[in-house]
Design a protein with these regions (language model features):
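Short hydrophobic alpha-helices and adjacent helix-cap/hinge residues
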Residues: 1-175
Length: 175
């Protein structure tokens, strides 16, 4: 029994592709894999009451299912599992993916958790743009307005300012 816990809703291309890829790789008659897929839809619903409801739902739903593995995608699922795994899924191995701003100490007390982080090179990207197009005066960045989109914007600005790239080119974001 493998639980795939996605942070977002099932209609997002990223979620569809990731879920399908996991099933394609791990679905085998040899292993008789049974998948359980949960989509937290946390870009649409993000408050303490909602996460409490998910805690209660998953507790009831998986109480008698002997999970062998949990695969989580993105920060909300990762954070939810870190906060609740010892109660909901004690000793079940967890592999996360797509986690932003990861620090090893986040899982230091969780030997059952491992995974792959998500990182991008914003400063290197801007430097490459300026090297390829030295006449550039303005860079306009398009991002979404979700919680993670706003966090990316802040992080990018912090990195760009720290590298003094804002003195070479004007950076603006879609507002």
């Amino acid at each position: 029994h493998i639980l795939i816990l996605n942070s977002y809703h099932q209609e997002m291309t990223w979620v569809k592709n990731l879920t399908q890829a996991v099933q394609d790789v791990l679905d085998s008659d040899e292993f008789n894999t049974i998948f359980h897929i949960e989509n937290m839809s946390s870009k649409r619903h993000y408050n303490e009451q909602y996460f409490d409801s998910l805690f209660n739902l998953y507790g009831a739903k998986y109480k008698k299912i002997p999970l062998d593995l949990i695969l989580s995608s993105d920060n909300h699922a990762f954070n939810f599992l870190r906060q609740n795994t010892r109660i909901l899924f004690p000793k079940v191995p967890i592999v996360f993916s797509g986690v932003n701003y990861f620090k090893p100490e986040q899982i230091a007390e969780y030997p059952e958790i491992t995974g792959v982080t998500e990182a991008f090179s914003d400063v290197d990207t801007v430097k490459a743009m300026l090297k390829l197009h030295p006449e550039t005066k303005d860079i306009f960045i398009i991002n979404d307005y979700t919680l993670s989109g706003k966090a990316w914007t802040k992080t990018m600005l912090d990195h760009i300012y720290a590298a003094n790239l804002d003195t070479q080119v004007r950076i603006s974001f879609a507002e």
